[in-house]
Swiss-Prot record:
Gene3D superfamilies: Transcription elongation factor, GreA/GreB, C-terminal domain, Transcription elongation factor, GreA/GreB, N-terminal domain. It comes from Brucella anthropi (strain ATCC 49188 / DSM 6882 / CCUG 24695 / JCM 21032 / LMG 3331 / NBRC 15819 / NCTC 12168 / Alc 37). InterPro entries: GreA/GreB_C_sf, TF_GreA/GreB_CS, Tscrpt_elong_fac_GreA, Tscrpt_elong_fac_GreA/B, Tscrpt_elong_fac_GreA/B_C, Tscrpt_elong_fac_GreA/B_fam, Tscrpt_elong_fac_GreA/B_N, Tscrpt_elong_fac_GreA/B_N_sf. The keyword Nucleotidyltransferase does not apply. It comes from the Bacteria. Keywords: DNA-binding, Transcription, Transcription regulation. Necessary for efficient RNA polymerase transcription elongation past template-encoded arresting sites. The arresting sites in DNA have the property of trapping a certain fraction of elongating RNA polymerases that pass through, resulting in locked ternary complexes. Cleavage of the nascent transcript by cleavage factors such as GreA or GreB allows the resumption of elongation from the new 3'terminus. GreA releases sequences of 2 to 3 nucleotides. GO terms for biological process: DNA-templated transcription elongation; regulation of DNA-templated transcription elongation. GO terms for molecular function: DNA binding; RNA polymerase binding. This is Transcription elongation factor GreA. Transmembrane segments: none annotated. Belongs to the GreA/GreB family.
């Protein structure tokens, strides 16, 4: 069983979604199936088929979440330190073309959300950042072309 890194916050979100799907969504879908079944002929019962499909999707996601929870290796970022970028680091960098400041935390694949400033450890930017430190410059090949960033801050929070 291959483990993957995850922050405590990301792990809690996974467990929260799993609980919701098991304790709220599953009973709601079962009730919808029972209600649709009460309408009679199942062969042409769109409500029944929609509820069964929702059940299948929900159970699939529950299985996926159970697997992720079992394989997660929780890394408490607040206990990390150092002057080199690694998993969990929050990095401040300046785009050398636009002088725009960007702040990203490097997290596990399952908890990445660029809009929230969390990038996957397997993303091109994170791969370029790993092992670097303040003052270093990285080059990232993105779909829109190559970008250069100067690392101006590094912390573990």
């Amino acid at each position: 069983m291959e483990k993957f890194p995850m922050t405590p916050g990301g792990f809690e979100k996974l467990k929260e979604e799993l609980r919701w799907r098991q304790q709220s969504e599953r009973p709601r879908i079962i009730e919808a199936i029972a209600e649709a079944r009460a309408h009679g002929d199942l062969s042409e019962n769109a409500e029944y088929h929609a509820a069964k499909e929702a059940q299948s999707l929900n159970e699939g996601r529950i299985n996926e979440l159970e697997d992720l929870v079992a394989r997660a290796e929780i890394i408490d970022v607040s206990k990390l330190s150092g002057d080199r970028i690694k998993f969990g680091a929050t990095v401040t960098m300046i785009d050398e073309d636009t002088d725009e400041e960007k702040v990203y935390q490097i997290v596990g694949d399952q908890e990445a959300d660029v809009k929230e400033g969390r990038i996957s450890i397997s993303s091109p930017i994170a791969r370029a950042l790993i092992g670097k430190g303040e003052g270093d410059t990285i080059e990232v090949n993105a779909p829109g072309g190559s970008r250069s960033y100067e690392i101006v801050g590094l912390k573990f929070v």
